[in-house]
Amino acid sequence: MSQPAVTASSARQFRAGLNGAVVVFALLFVAAVMPVLWPNLPPAMVDYSNHLARMFVLARDGTAQAHPYYQVTWSLVPNLAMDLIVPGIGRHIGVEMANRLFYLLSQILIVTGAMALERAVKGRLQIAGFVALIFLYSTPFAFGFENFEFGLGCALWGFACAVWLQDRSWLARFAAHTAFVALLFTAHMFALGIYGFAVGLHELWRAWSQRASLRETFARFSALVIPSLLLAAFMVAANGSVGGSGNVWVFGDKATWILHILSGYNMVVSEIGVLALIWLITALARRNALRLEQSAMWLLAGFSALYLAMPFRLFDTAFVDMRVVVALALIMPAFVSVSFPDAIWRRIAIALAAAITVINVSGVMIVWLSYREDFAAARKSFELLPKGAIVMTAQTGDGGDPPTDLRDYPVFNVPTLAVHHADAFLPHLFTAPGKQPVTPRAPWRRLEFPERGFLPVRFLKYVAEHGAPAGTPPFVQNWVRDFDYLYLIGPSIPNPMPDRLEFVLGAPRFALYRIRK
């Protein structure tokens, strides 16, 4: 007669634990997006400022205030999510606010997309939301890869829809795949690749596990492949492109990058967080608390192989292999069911997820707060630039990109905001053909150098004193003659060329000089 009481007590404990997890998740979500919601906190992410500068150019296009050095040339290229969304909204609420809200929307898509996928696979929500919060400021996202983050969030939703519709009619699956292929191509090409790869692996598992006939397998894959083939044919007919042609493999760093994926600002924090997650996964696995669902092993094996094979730079897009790791980290929780041995282990898991999230977000807040003086000084420096100045950027360090201390990385692209505030020309504004719809006007194209890193100032000094050696990029061969001002980014150093540079303004992480003619 005591069993019903025990069962009722267990049910109450389960509901209490579930309600507690929901409350903790809600609080963690608010904490995780707090840096973006804080209006006076500068978003100190390396690519964010460069993207923001391009949004200003797009918002001004077609008006009397169109930029004197840059033009907008629309074509059939991917990676246009923010380019299509932010400028139009920015004309009504301000470009800076619109860009911040776009980044917030991308974060929401990442978290909700991971949760939607888990619900589609397991029929319930369990761990995916917590894992998504842990990775919300992982390396690709903390670097300000905005279109990729938005696209990956959409890809997670697309994968969830594919699982939801896997037993529906061919026409329903074809329509859904077509819609997501079009959406993801527009958002970010690599996010489209992640979506296609994940859905393809899931379909392979389904065909294998159900011993489907060749005819049925062909029919199912045709619903996935036909939209991609139509897109490819349309791109060929329209002379579209997907970026540059530079591919670079860095196999020696792949093991360490897994340890450094969790935080885009602090490698030690990332290492501790990754090792803590590995410990938790190992401890739960030893207690038979983890169960793989559906295509979990296929996804794990496929994405692991993809990570090993993927170059660091693909079509002139960097950190590509690290993006594979983040995608896998967001997908896998949906395919792993956890049966905690007891309430203590549930509390340990939630506490560990909360601790990693809070520590990671706190690190983000500390770095962003430390940049308030630099961003304020940058705005002041833009006021000191004459309208239409030709401005160059170089490093005080050794030319490393990224630098050894990732906390110094966000300053790299801050000077590009002079494109808007001073109508300036800068070689490093993102204007890569096949990736962005903004290009320099014809007279200035010889000076562009987008997405190719920042040269050390000692190299500029060598060119000024001895001439340009073979292989020197065109924009720097006659830099003293071609440019009016120079931003030196990185740790403060004495004036490296007093005879050629006149100090204008300094900040903790950069200095502005006028180039003497």
Question: Where is each model-derived feature located?
Answer:
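Transmembrane-helix motifs of polytopic, lipid-linked glycan transferases
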Residues: 101-121
